[in-house]
Structure formats: structure tokens, C-alpha cells
């Protein structure tokens, strides 16, 4: 299965009639493995900040998480495993695997829990597969 198929079929799939706004799978170095067409264009330093927060949980809390110039308030995640952010009626979930970052961005009517489920389920699967 291609990385793009994981984004199209597993991240951008329908869940309770809702879809993620955008999604991507990136390498820890910020290289794009696959992304939805409307995934925000990000800066390398934004990905570096995300990776640093996985290594040093709490790093992003004072400044917020930035992706594509959008600022998300960091909310409770799982230190070193999952970062969650909130902005208005939407937010972001990022799951770290051994080799990749799985990112899902949502807005209402999708709920944070639905986004977490989709992103973390794929991340757990990829971890089980050695990624």
C-alpha cells in the first residue's frame, strides 16, 4: 500500500459522517511521505518544534504549536507519543511513530475525539508494522 493510500483511505476516511479537514504523513525530518491536497504548507522550523516537543514534552506549551502559520494551543496529549492542539472550533492531533509523524487537522462538526481516533489508530498500526 502506498503512503498516499494511507492518507486517502485511513486518515481522510469517513467517521460518523465526518472527515478530517486535512491530513499528512511526514518523516521526522519534515519530508512529506503523503498528504491530502489541502494540507497546509508548513515551514521546516514548525516541524522541528513539533519533533522537539516529542523529545522534550512541554516545549510547545508556552508558545503554542504552529503549522502552516496557524497557531494551536497545546492541550493534554500523551508525552512523547501524541500532541494535541486546539484552535477555535477545530484542532490538530499528531501521533509519533518510530519513523513518521501522523497529522490530522479537523474542524466542527468533527470532534476532537474522532480526530484522535483516526490519527492514533493509524499511528498504532504503523508502529506495529515497524514504522
Swiss-Prot record:
GO terms for molecular function: actin monomer binding. Occurs in many kinds of cells as a complex with monomeric actin in a 1:1 ratio. SUPFAM superfamilies: Profilin (actin-binding protein). The keyword Nuclease does not apply. It comes from the Eukaryota. The keyword Cytoplasm applies. Pfam families: Profilin (PF00235). One of its GO terms (cellular component) is cell cortex. Belongs to the profilin family. Keywords: Actin-binding, Cytoplasm, Cytoskeleton. Binds to actin and affects the structure of the cytoskeleton. At high concentrations, profilin prevents the polymerization of actin, whereas it enhances it at low concentrations. By binding to PIP2, it inhibits the formation of IP3 and DG. It is found in: Cytoplasm, Cytoskeleton. PANTHER family: PROFILIN, PROFILIN LP04. This is Profilin-2.
Amino acid at each position: 500500500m502506498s503512503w498516499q493510500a494511507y492518507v486517502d483511505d485511513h486518515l481522510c476516511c469517513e467517521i460518523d459522517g465526518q472527515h478530517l479537514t486535512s491530513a499528512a504523513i511526514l518523516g521526522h525530518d519534515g519530508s512529506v511521505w503523503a498528504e491530502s491536497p489541502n494540507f497546509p504548507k508548513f515551514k521546516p522550523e514548525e516541524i522541528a518544534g513539533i519533533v522537539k516537543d516529542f523529545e522534550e514534552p512541554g516545549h510547545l506549551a508556552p508558545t503554542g504549536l504552529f503549522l502552516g502559520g496557524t497557531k494551536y494551543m497545546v492541550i493534554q496529549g500523551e508525552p512523547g507519543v501524541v500532541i494535541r492542539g486546539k484552535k477555535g472550533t477545530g484542532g490538530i492531533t499528531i501521533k509519533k511513530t518510530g519513523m513518521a509523524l501522523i497529522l490530522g487537522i479537523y474542524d466542527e462538526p468533527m470532534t476532537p475525539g474522532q480526530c484522535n481516533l483516526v490519527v492514533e489508530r493509524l499511528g498504532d498500526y504503523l508502529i506495529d508494522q515497524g514504522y
